[in-house]
Amino acid sequence: MKKDKMMIRIQNKNLLKSFDIPIIKAYDFDGTLFEPIGTYEKDYNLEKFKKDNTFFKNLFTEELPLAEELRKAKKRGNIIYIITAREWKWWFPLLLWLKNIPYDEIRQRPKARENISTHKLKKEQLIELISKYGNSYELDFYDDSSLNCNEIEQGIKYAVVHKV
């Protein structure tokens, strides 16, 4: 049944465009658009990840296929959000520009929010971003974490979640 509902939503996206209902695409960065740096997803060593998370190392991460889909979505006029649990870095927008990743808004982990879980943080940030549209939007959320996907699916109306 869930697949049928998703197919109906996909077919209705063209109809949404004719009514000027915004289509929002929200993407995680690590493991979704680009290969993650370091081994955090395997060893959950946050201090090691912070040490590995340098501008130089990020320049050489391998692009994943969804990055090209993001570019196509932006060309179609969709609203693009990048939502990452990475600690705030001044150079992250520059990195996205160098990697040719267009976006409308970015959310990184604020330094003061280090202790909140990733799935709760992403849900809060996404709610903040979509709240300006009220109930008039179509949201696609892309993430490689089942926990993040479940949190968004259960906590945000009108979200179509894509686990990659």
Where are the language model's segments positioned?
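Alpha-helical elements of Rossmann-like donor-binding domains used by nucleotide-donor carbohydrate transfer enzymes
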Residues: E68-E69, Q125, E151
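Surface-exposed amphipathic alpha-helices with a cationic face
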Residues: L70-K74, I130, E153
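Conserved Lys-Pro-Asp/Glu-containing loop-to-beta segment of HAD-superfamily phosphomonoesterases
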Residues: I23, K122-S146
